[in-house]
């Protein structure tokens, strides 16, 4: 095993040609470091259609994990946000993270972040996070859009009376 420190950066979104700004941001960060002499190993974790590793440079890799329950499964409801994993935990990732000296999550709410919190507690690995998206506001928006598709009486009950979209977000 390398004596270099290993840092895991968990993006928790699908890496594909249609990926949005959050994924592009981390791709650009990795590309800006390609020609640098790093004394650390950086591994960026993304989601994808199948599990694989993409070697970006000597010290930079992309590990692609297949989501347990992809948010793309909900596209029939009109959810068109970037694809994430809605599973509660990713066991493969949990055991992979024991090999890292630092774990960094780029969200706090989805599968990779939840898995990172657990891994940090189990293996006493430092955990940092950065906040890039106002996920609660997005959640409220999408829940409201889904509820509007219900029959009128349920729409009124869930939105106007119970305000479900406010409670879930």
Model-derived features: where do they sit?
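Short N-terminal targeting/anchoring amphipathic segment
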Residues: 93-112, 123-130
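Short, hinge-like loop/turn segments at secondary-structure boundaries
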Residues: 58-63, 122, 144-149
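N-terminal subdomain of nucleotide-sugar transferases
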Residues: 1-60, 98
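Short, well-ordered alpha-helical microsegments
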Residues: 50-51, 111-114
């Amino acid at each position: 095993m390398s004596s270099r420190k290993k840092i895991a950066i968990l993006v928790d979104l699908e890496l594909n040609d249609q990926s949005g700004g959050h994924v592009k941001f981390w791709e650009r960060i990795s590309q800006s470091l390609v020609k640098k002499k790093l004394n650390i190993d950086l591994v960026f974790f993304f989601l994808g259609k199948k599990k694989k590793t993409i070697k970006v440079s000597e010290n930079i890799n992309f590990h692609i994990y297949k989501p347990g329950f992809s948010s793309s499964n909900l596209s029939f409801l009109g959810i068109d946000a970037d694809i994430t994993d809605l599973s509660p935990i990713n066991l493969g990732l949990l055991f992979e993270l024991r090999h890292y000296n630092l774990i960094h999550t780029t969200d706090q709410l989805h599968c990779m972040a939840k898995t990172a919190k657990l891994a940090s507690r189990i293996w006493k690995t430092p955990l940092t996070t950065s906040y890039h998206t106002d996920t609660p506001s997005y959640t409220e928006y999408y829940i409201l859009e889904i509820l509007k598709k219900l029959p009128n009486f349920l729409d009124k009950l869930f939105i106007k009376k119970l305000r479900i979209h406010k409670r879930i977000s």
